[in-house]
Amino acid sequence: MSMMSFMMRMACKKNDAKRDAGLVYPDNVVRVENISYGPHKMNVLDVYRPQTTEAKLPVIVSVHGGGWVYGDKELYSYYCADLAKRGFAVVNFTYRLSPENKFPCHLEDTTLVFDWVKKNADKFGMDTEHVFAVGDSAGGHILALYCSLCTNPEFAANFDFKPVENLLPKAIALNCAVLDIDTIDGGMSSSSMKLMNDVLPKNKKKEYLPLVNPIAHVNEKFPPCFIMTCNEDFLKEQPETFKKKLEDFGVPYKYEFYGDEENLLGHVFHLDMKNEVGRLCNDEECDYFKSFLV
């Protein structure tokens, strides 16, 4: 493991513990925990539903962030429970991390989760006609690649696993996400790109680097997007070229920039259940998804 990945894990763990300190799990959300969705030890997920209904609900699949080297479903439990309160069945999963596992493991595990959703929809009251997804930071990167796996046959041909048939998300939310590797501040010397040294197979870096750039694989079939960033996000410039690419292909999107001089908001602020603007952002994303419930 590189020093960059080690420092990433230590810093994120400390920040996440501070973020969630004192939070109490809501008593109006039911959670089914630690369901296996694949062959690997880390292939586990939780399902969240509002306690007030047993009806089939629209689905949100949450793809966690963490620079491809950190994170799991436990760190997103309060966030996903909060989404469920808005009337969704929420799927929160852990995927294999780098550097112990190499790309495309993150993408393969995400594909397995969507396959699990399709196969277990009736058991867990999930409406597969209305599946949505959210991803933040590296999770947004993985989610964008998954959507291209579903919509771009040329991109999909690079992998020996296939997307779930007829389960492209109706819309997605890309939150403080890595969307255009070529425009990351600092380029190849940036922290994000240094992490790629731990993510990509050593003998396939040259082959895989173009594959891991989400903007390169967008086409007219890419799903509608809610794209957000904020004033203190180190990836706040990422949406600019991505929005232009969506416009070129006629893909609908909604863009929101949060924060101002009196309200400084950092990377993935929406995960903080104590942050009023973060909760507003989550409200607006869920309202965006609900606009597709027709």
Task: Please state what every model-predicted region is.
Residues M1-V294:
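Alpha/beta-hydrolase superfamily serine-hydrolase fold, recognizing
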